[in-house]
Amino acid sequence: MILKSISYHNFRNFIDEKFQIHPQLTAILGDNARGKTNLLEGIYFILRGEGFRESREEQLIKFTEKNSYVDAKLQERKTKDVSNLRIDLTLNDFGISKTYFLEKTKKGRHSYLKNLIPVVLFSPEQIEIIDRTMSIRREYFDKFLSSIDPEYKKKLTNYNQAFRRRNKILEIGFESENLDAQLDYWNKLLIDNGTYLIIKRRKYINYLNSNKTIDSKEFSIEYIENKISRERFSEILKKELLVKRTLIGPHRDEYNIFMIEKKIQKKDIHLYGSRSEQRLGLFWLKINELKYLEEYYRKKPILLLDDIFSELDHKNQKLIFNLIGNYQTVVTSTEKELTKLINLTNDSSYDTINL
């Protein structure tokens, strides 16, 4: 299945626009602030039901407008059958609402998303997964696992709600009525939901560690579970009452990413990796994300590349170029970068969108 076309109404800076997407490679060209990343984000949005930037969802709607939509056509490669999909955005006094449609029939989010093409994004900002804090890595894995497993998303939401409520009780401390009973209730919720999260995280990390190699280099992830149990809650309660927050559980899990040198030595690339090694580690994560999604859904994902070529050295550029022949790809680029891309991939099968 491929993305055939996409249309925007009052989405970001687009008023009414429609774009055809090439089955192999589409390059979005244009000066800064012309909307290259907005176009890319719209593709991500129609296939994932959310944008990929940190801004609030209300900002997906064009400034001063109250309603927006993105619609698209997907096509089966073999049968040429076409599917129509659309997401409406509406801004009201209570915030923003999203309505999902397949073939003009209203759907729930999960029902809408489950049969679409998976999508993977590369962008320069994602290097923060490697070079910033542990919470960024936890957020990355949680977001990925939530995107493929509705139960994971539900359990994560339940866990975070229970975590916040338990912290409120710890803030009140001994002044709270029925302290032990209240803590027992929230402890059980944290254990039940947290155990599911840990199992699913461990399963995906095992997958990554079974696919270690990229460009003759090997990487691995050390997943350190912050175990959660009634016994541990009992042992640490006095300290938690002192600091007034929950100190154990998967919200404190750690992911350490290593490059393996000479088959023996492991280098923590967050702490000791060069910029090039950190980028290679990021590519290792994202390439495995592509492969995992392809195996999981039995469909080839769409690859979105946002302004990455100026950030990469020649060696890492070639790694990305090698991917492009295997997946439908949409890339934001400049004329100069596009020329280099076409020369390196030896592929004349592409189209451009000029903004």
What are these regions (language model features)?
Residues 1-31, 45, 177-302, 311, ...:
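Conserved NTPase motor "head" modules and their coupling/switch loops across ABC/AAA+ ATPases, GTPases
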Residues 36:
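Conserved lysine of the Walker
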Residues 48-130, 134-136, 145-148, 152, ...:
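Nucleotide-state sensing region of NTPase/ATPase domains
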Residues 72, 328-335:
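Structural recognition of the conserved hydrophobic beta-strand(s) that form the central parallel beta-sheet
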Residues 122-215, 224-227:
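An accessory alpha-helical subdomain
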Residues 306-308:
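Walker B catalytic acidic pair
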Residues 343-355:
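A short helix-turn-beta junction within AAA+ P-loop NTPase domains corresponding to the substrate/partner-engaging
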